[in-house]
Amino acid sequence: MAYPFQLGLQDATSPIMEELLHFHDHTLMIVFLISSLILYIISLMLTTKLTHTSTMDAQEVETVWTILPAIILILIALPSLRILYMMDEINNPSLTVKTMGHQWYWSYEYTDYEDLNFDSYMIPTQELKPGELRLLEVDNRVVLPMEMTIRMLISSEDVLHSWAVPSLGLKTDAIPGRLNQTTLMATRPGLYYGQCSEICGSNHSFMPIVLEMVPLSYFETWSALMV
């Protein structure tokens, strides 16, 4: 999860987030090289006498500054498109969970079970226990099995919301009258926090998301107790 004064992204907990981190580093390196080149050229212009101020034609230079940006854009676009298509893949999910956004809480329904559904509200600050996180804890966590492909169906009952968990690389809009879907798979157990990421009203900041990823045996025990 995030920590104070953090400069980078959250630690990756899913294959998709790993890919996004690699793409971030790849793009950041390209930006760094371009910025270094521009700063070098500016420093030369400020410290040396300008030459070729009356040049009317420079075919070689024009060719370079046309082709080079095109190559750079291709180097950014190709890995970006690859990840985009990976995020849209649905590969035989082991479990489906339907998520509905409300003003201002989330409701969850495990569609593979006959009667497993609940609402998830933020715990008020005055009711937090020692060690719990302000504005991030909920009364009912979403318990899911780790190392399994899970499909999330996401929609809204009222206004636009967005269901986001940064460490899993997830952000899907919850739109009234429309059912969006995404997949997730956590590679290790733990608690993963997120929040509504679309301004949805006065209590937009009070719609946290908590995923509790557990081994399959623990999930089966939990689901048996909940049904």
Curated annotation (Swiss-Prot):
Q: Which domain of life is it from?
A: Eukaryota
Q: Which UniProt keywords apply?
A: Copper, Electron transport, Magnesium, Membrane, Metal-binding, Mitochondrion, Mitochondrion inner membrane, Phosphoprotein, Respiratory chain, Translocase, Transmembrane, Transmembrane helix, Transport
Topology in membrane:
Multi-pass membrane protein
Q: Where does this chain mainly localize?
A: mitochondrion
Where does this protein hold Cu cation A1? 161, 196, 200, 207
Segments on the Mitochondrial intermembrane side according to the record's topology features = 1-14, 88-227
User: Which GO terms of type biological process are on file?
Assistant: ATP synthesis coupled electron transport
Q: Which SUPFAM superfamilies match?
A: Cupredoxins, Cytochrome c oxidase subunit II-like, transmembrane region
The segments annotated as topological domain Mitochondrial matrix are: 46-59
Textual note on the cofactor: Binds a dinuclear copper A center per subunit.
Recall the GO molecular function terms of this protein's record. copper ion binding; cytochrome-c oxidase activity
Q: What does this protein do?
A: Component of the cytochrome c oxidase, the last enzyme in the mitochondrial electron transport chain which drives oxidative phosphorylation. The respiratory chain contains 3 multisubunit complexes succinate dehydrogenase (complex II, CII), ubiquinol-cytochrome c oxidoreductase (cytochrome b-c1 complex, complex III, CIII) and cytochrome c oxidase (complex IV, CIV), that cooperate to transfer electrons derived from NADH and succinate to molecular oxygen, creating an electrochemical gradient over the inner membrane that drives transmembrane transport and the ATP synthase.
Q: What family, per the record?
A: Belongs to the cytochrome c oxidase subunit 2 family.
| Protein known as | Cytochrome c oxidase subunit 2
- Species of origin reads Canis simensis (Ethiopian wolf)
